């Protein structure tokens, strides 16, 4: 084991023990979870993730309603769950016991530098779901995203109509450039600005040189360079389990949450959802419902459960011998955000480094005050939303996640699943001072699918995102390369002796000259990562639209008493990280289910 990895392991162990002693109250919380369940409930929620936890809280407010949540993962109160609580440690939560550890099928147009050409696709398998293992970044998306949903037939989902639900959830810690009218101060979800070092100011100044402003990207204008907003409260991750689920579990007897409950299928009789079959402790069990079943298992698992229940593409279901209940395009329209990373080295130790993150001083600072670099969400302190497509000058097409430190070879191999035959290309990266800019394609034109691997619910589905299948996606990433090079020429970057860190890549040099468009098109097909935002596999829209699975009320077409409430319903992927939109979807769905009149649209904002 390399020295860096050994030091990291030692520090994680120290941190786990000390944090457990100082902050842990797991036994008390765990005792509130259901040990067994009743035969029947009014509502059954499958999945306690970003949207499911919100639903569980809102539906159980009425003490006359019995609500059951079935979560395939464990609770988040185990000693090992320390890795979930400390914001800087989020990379270690992925590929852990709290992750489904999905991977795509081999990709034709990207991932050539990854093991088996497969994209890792982390998804949270724990109370709180992916809000527990993501990078905490809080982005709502662009107002045009939601207005386009509305124009496409999703009545009630325009920006002015969904904004009140974003505000409802939020408990923002005020920051310098905050546009107050766009934020909430009384909701359960803790949100704060991530500004630990001078790195956000550095990025903002560089952006100004290229004509970009700053402010509040969750306010009136998304375009610009900013300090990141994150679901971090008092130095700890604020997952939806912490914000919404645990307070309800502890205080409400009508809410039952069963962990390690892996759903096999929804039971449907005469086009009505009447119950759920699930595995718990190795035994197949069933539970009935009086009102509705809500799938909130995410854009990869919800379509799998639907297809196992007989709802999906007819020919695919027949291939697996599953009786067809409803012929719907379940699992189609998969969209995800793909990235490439630009590495910069600096003359001096300007912001932070991987070694500093591992230092005992950082640990001591965090444990005594819950401040310092360990509160930075995966090192992300700054975001930018830039426009490189002349056809949409005010609608950002790329997002930059700016990470204030360098990674090292071990982290790249572990998290990115780098193919070892390309190890020399990243050798030495951990020994330099610098930072990383991760460019994210916001509106990919490429669409993929989720399909069944077998009729065994315990097997992972077949996930084929078809990244970069559409040429326009590669064109967008190439424009990002050129923008990144332009950033390096700014006075701000030059003031710190900033240089682009890139070893010319031999397989691409064999085909083209270094720094040519052809070189970068080749390179961008090797070292990609996703930011793990799968969406769209149970698409929302007009009932008569043959590409949709749910109507604007999130009801599965042709099936009574069954809704989908998660990222899978998005008709098109949002321009940014998907956790905040999923929470909004949960809030809005709760009002729909309970028949509560929606808040007045905020049309003047």
Where are these regions (language model features)?
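N-terminal redox-cofactor-binding region of secreted/periplasmic oxidoreductases
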Residues: 2-605
């Amino acid at each position: 084991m390399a020295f860096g990895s050994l030091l990291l392991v030692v520090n994680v162990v120290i941190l786990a023990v000390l944090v457990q002693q100082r902050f842990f109250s797991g036994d008390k919380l765990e005792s509130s979870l259901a040990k067994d369940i009743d035969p029947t409930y009014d509502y059954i929620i499958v999945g306690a993730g970003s949207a499911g936890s919100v639903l569980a809280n809102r539906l159980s407010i009425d003490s006359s309603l019995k609500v059951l949540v079935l979560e395939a993962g464990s609770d988040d109160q185990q000693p090992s769950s320390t890795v979930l609580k400390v914001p800087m440690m989020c990379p270690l939560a992925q590929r852990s016991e709290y992750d489904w550890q999905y991977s795509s099928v081999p990709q034709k147009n990207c991932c050539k530098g990854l093991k088996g050409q497969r994209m890792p696709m982390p998804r949270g398998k724990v109370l709180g779901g992916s809000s527990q293992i993501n990078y905490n970044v809080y982005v709502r998306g662009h107002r045009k995203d939601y207005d386009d949903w509305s124009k496409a037939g999703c009545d009630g989902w325009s920006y002015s109509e969904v904004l009140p639900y974003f505000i409802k959830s939020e408990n923002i810690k005020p920051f310098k450039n905050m546009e107050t009218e766009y934020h909430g101060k009384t909701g359960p979800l803790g949100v704060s600005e991530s500004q630990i070092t001078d790195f956000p100011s550095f990025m903002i100044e560089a952006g100004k040189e290229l004509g970009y402003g700053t402010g509040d990207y969750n306010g009136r204008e998304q375009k610009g360079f900013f300090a990141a907003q994150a679901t971090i409260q008092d130095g700890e991750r604020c997952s939806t389990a912490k914000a919404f689920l645990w307070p309800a579990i502890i205080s409400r007897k009508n809410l039952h949450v069963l962990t390690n409950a892996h759903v096999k299928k929804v039971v449907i009789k005469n086009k009505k959802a009447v119950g759920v079959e699930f595995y718990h402790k190795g035994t197949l069990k069933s539970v009935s419902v009086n009102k509705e079943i809500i799938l909130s298992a995410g854009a990869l698992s919800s379509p799998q459960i639907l297809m196992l229940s007989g709802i999906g593409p007819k020919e695919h279901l027949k291939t697996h011998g599953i009786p067809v209940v409803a012929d719907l395009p379940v699992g189609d329209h998969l969209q995800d955000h793909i990235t490439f990373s630009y590495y910069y080295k600096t003359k001096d130790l300007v912001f932070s480094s991987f070694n500093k993150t591992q230092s005992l001083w950082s640990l001591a600072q965090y444990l005594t005050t819950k401040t310092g670099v360990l509160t930075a969400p995966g090192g992300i302190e700054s975001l930018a939303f830039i426009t490189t497509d002349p056809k949409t000058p005010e609608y950002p097409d790329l997002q930059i996640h700016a990470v204030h430190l360098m990674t090292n070879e071990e982290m790249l191999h572990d998290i990115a699943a780098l193919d070892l035959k390309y190890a020399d290309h990243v050798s030495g990266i951990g020994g330099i001072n610098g930072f990383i800019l991760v460019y994210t394609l916001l509106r990919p034109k490429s669409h993929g699918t989720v399909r069944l691997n077998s009729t065994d619910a315990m097997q992972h589905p077949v996930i084929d995102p078809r990244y970069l299948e559409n040429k326009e996606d590669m064109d967008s990433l190439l424009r990002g390369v050129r923008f990144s090079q332009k950033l390096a020429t700014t006075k701000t970057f030059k003031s710190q002796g900033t240089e682009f860190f890139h070893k010319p890549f031999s397989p691409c040099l064999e085909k083209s000259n270094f720094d040519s468009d052809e070189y970068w098109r080749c390179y961008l097909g090797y070292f990609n990562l996703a930011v793990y935002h799968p969406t769209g596999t149970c698409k929302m829209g007009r009932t008569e639209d043959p590409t949709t699975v749910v109507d604007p009320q999130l009801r599965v077409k042709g099936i009574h008493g069954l809704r989908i409430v998660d990222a899978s319903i998005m008709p098109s992927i949002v321009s940014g990280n998907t956790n905040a939109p999923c929470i909004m979807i949960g809030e809005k769905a709760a009002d729909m289910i309970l028949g509560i009149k929606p808040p007045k649209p905020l049309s003047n904002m």
